[in-house]
Amino acid sequence: MAKLIIPSDYDPKMTIRETEKAIRYIRETFQTEFGTAMNLERISAPMFVKKSSGLNDNLSGWEKPVSFTLHDGNEGELQIVHSLAKWKRWALKHYGFSHGEGLFTNMNAIRKDEEVLDNLHSVYVDQWDWEKVIDKSERTEATLRQTVQRIFETIKGMEYHVRALYPQAAYHLPEEISFVTSEELEARWPSLTPSEREDKICQEKGAVFLEHIGGALPLSKKPHDLRAPDYDDWTLNGDLLFWYEPLQRAFEVSSMGIRVDEDRLQEQLKLAGAEDRLDLPFHQALLKGDLPYSIGGGIGQSRLCMLLLGKAHIGEVQASIWPDEIVEKCQAAKIQLL
């Protein structure tokens, strides 16, 4: 399904070549400042993993990854990654990262089953996937919120950099971020859909970290949004959202969380009806205590560029494939798809 929001009287303010230069600047500058602020080291990341490893991100549970086999077939089915959520935790262990240290990667993924292709969603996903070692005693809301605050401040700092170089295009971000839970949103707006609740709270607050994604809510008995049961702890995770004036909607830049421990892994797999995953190598390692406790997430590279440059469509900051109807409408509205 394809949906498109056309801002009235849209003016891109930058040529395609100017946009490309700005994209490069944002990507290079942000990853340096983000890595420094979070004590993260950049490492290489796989484009595909073995299906049998259990390392791929199952997302909501129904999306099928792009898969293939090698010529001799000896390695079994290989899958293009959806994200590196579980692989990163494995890498923390095998690359020798210690408490307080972490990694980030330049992650590229294909999500062929993306339900809606719109201003924010593409089948091509590029993000800074990151993971950091913590102690079990740090598996707390305080740790989560401190980390969110640090990421928000790094993004806010990027706004000042972009405004200095591209004052005609830079989008103004709020000065502060608010914290709210999905349960609080449901209680306040029970008749609205989860996405409508996000729009409401973001328009009110400007920037929000929405906590508790994945578990069933008290009133609806349904989760605010689906989340894989074997990486985030659903009680210690969330999405970083901004109110985005050009599209008049909430704008997600990052999803992150404190990762499951041995107990939460088993609890969430049972709730999801996915206990068969416990036999996979990744899950066995976690149950045996062979993997570190960690916090991690992903920050959308194209999303961040789009936000900071005030673009109307993610296709203005990444090269992807779009339905002909969207391409034609974008051309008519001066939206310059790459």
From Swiss-Prot:
Residue intervals passing through the bilayer: none
EC category name: ligase
Reactions catalysed, semicolon-separated, are: L-aspartate + NH4(+) + ATP = L-asparagine + AMP + diphosphate + H(+)
A GO BP entry = L-asparagine biosynthetic process
UniProt KW keywords: Amino-acid biosynthesis, Asparagine biosynthesis, ATP-binding, Cytoplasm, Ligase, Nucleotide-binding
Q: In which pathway does it act?
A: Amino-acid biosynthesis; L-asparagine biosynthesis; L-asparagine from L-aspartate (ammonia route): step 1/1
Q: Mention any one GO cellular component term assigned to this protein in its UniProt record.
A: cytosol
Q: Which domain of life does the protein's organism represent?
A: Bacteria
Where does the UniProt annotation place the signal sequence? none
Q: What PROSITE patterns is this protein classified in?
A: AA_TRNA_LIGASE_II
User: Which GO molecular function terms does the record list?
Assistant: aspartate-ammonia ligase activity; ATP binding; catalytic activity, acting on a protein; transferase activity
- Record keywords: ATP-binding included? yes
Q: What broad class describes the main subcellular location of this protein?
A: cytoplasm
Q: Does the keyword Ligase apply?
A: yes
Location(s), subcellular: Cytoplasm
What InterPro entries does UniProt report for this protein, alphabetically?
aa-tRNA-synth_II, aa-tRNA-synth_II/BPL/LPL, AsnA
Enzyme nomenclature, EC number:
6.3.1.1
Spell out the family assignment given in the record's similarity comment: Belongs to the class-II aminoacyl-tRNA synthetase family. AsnA subfamily.
Q: What is this protein called?
A: Aspartate--ammonia ligase
Organism whose genome encodes this protein? Lactobacillus delbrueckii subsp. bulgaricus (strain ATCC BAA-365 / Lb-18)
What gene name is given for the protein in this entry? asnA
